């Protein structure tokens, strides 16, 4: 962590354009004078100027072209579903579930709990490669559907609790954690910052994280009570929540993989103007070049100093920058 640079967008926001160029050059494995680096640096400057004021929590209530409220709710919903799909019920109480709900002996339950944690750790590895290649939206759908079916297997085996069915119930729990580890575990931490507008990203991320811990607390508190009341009912409950999350992800989660953050703004603005689902616009819209993003921004009426993202009288305007070198000052003025 000590060796990691600041993000180029943060450096641009603070006026450190030279440092931002160096980070972009390192990301692209090229020089600071490369056309792609200069283009992205200029586009970041433009976006930071448009969204110069830091959005308050009140700004999240906006429903205009920026779709701040919808985007905040989408980000928070990913954290809600992460918890209410049963992950921590399985993770925290895996040994107890094997022993008390599936009725395995104590020693075997401890062994299976250790194997469960090992499988969980190993199953996270594919996410490093799949998140960009497969995409966020598809992984959400795969995760929710796979988790739901896994808990249906567990529930069905526990309705008639025999020794043979207990093995099937354990398989269902293992399948659940495999699906969770490479899909719904990482995605809710990646998706909300990508989906939210630059000026409201901090406030929206705070709400998203708060949603995670509130729902985490709720699930951990009611799981033992629910499990004691109905051994198979708790798995039916979590299965239904997972299956409910599938249409939610389908209709409300546009794909963000491979997109500039500015393209996400255009997707929601275009969806607002054309009265379409954001995921439909994202599917129809090809990856845009810098010039195409500028032109679409003009076409959608988003080119006036963040007119659709900053209400009249809101904020104090762009923050004055302190530059650490003459080069940065010249870059800012030029």
What are the residue ranges of the model-derived segments?
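Short intracellular "coupling" helices and adjacent cytoplasmic loop segments at the cytosolic face
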Residues: 26-38
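Cytosol/matrix-facing amphipathic helices and coiled-coil assembly/linker segments
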Residues: 37-51
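Alpha-helical transmembrane bundle of multi-pass membrane proteins
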Residues: 1-26, 48-334
């Amino acid at each position: 962590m000590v060796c990691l640079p600041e993000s180029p967008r943060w450096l641009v926001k603070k006026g450190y354009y030279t440092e931002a160029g160096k980070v972009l050059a390192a990301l692209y494995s090229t020089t600071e004078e490369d056309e792609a680096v200069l283009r992205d640096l200029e586009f970041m400057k433009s976006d930071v100027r448009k969204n110069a004021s830091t959005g308050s929590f009140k700004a999240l209530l906006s429903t205009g072209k920026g779709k701040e409220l919808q985007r905040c709710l989408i980000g928070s919903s990913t954290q809600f579903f992460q918890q209410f799909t049963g992950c921590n019920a399985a993770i925290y109480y895996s040994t107890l579930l094997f022993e008390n709900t599936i009725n395995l002996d104590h020693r075997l339950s401890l062994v299976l709990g250790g194997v469960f944690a090992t499988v969980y750790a190993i199953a996270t590895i594919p996410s490093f490669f799949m998140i960009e290649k497969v995409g966020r939206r598809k992984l959400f759908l795969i995760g929710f559907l796979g988790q739901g079916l896994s808990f249906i297997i567990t529930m069905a085996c526990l309705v008639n609790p025999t020794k043979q069915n207990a093995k099937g119930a354990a398989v269902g729990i293992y399948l659940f954690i495999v699906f969770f580890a490479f899909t719904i575990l990482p995605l809710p931490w990646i998706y909300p910052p990508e989906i939210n507008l630059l000026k409201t990203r901090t406030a929206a991320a705070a709400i998203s994280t708060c949603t995670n811990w509130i729902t985490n607390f709720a699930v951990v508190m009611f799981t033992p009570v629910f499990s004691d009341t109905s051994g198979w009912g708790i798995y039916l409950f979590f299965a239904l929540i997972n299956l409910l999350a599938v249409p939610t992800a389908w209709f409300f989660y546009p794909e963000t993989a491979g997109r500039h953050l500015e393209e996400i703004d255009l997707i929601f603005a275009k969806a607002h103007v054309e009265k379409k689902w954001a995921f439909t616009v994202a599917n129809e819209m090809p990856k845009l070049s810098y010039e195409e993003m500028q032109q679409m921004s003009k076409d959608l009426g988003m080119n006036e100093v963040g007119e659709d993202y900053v209400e009249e009288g809101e904020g104090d305007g762009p923050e004055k920058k302190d530059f650490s070198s003459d080069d940065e000052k010249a870059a800012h003025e030029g």
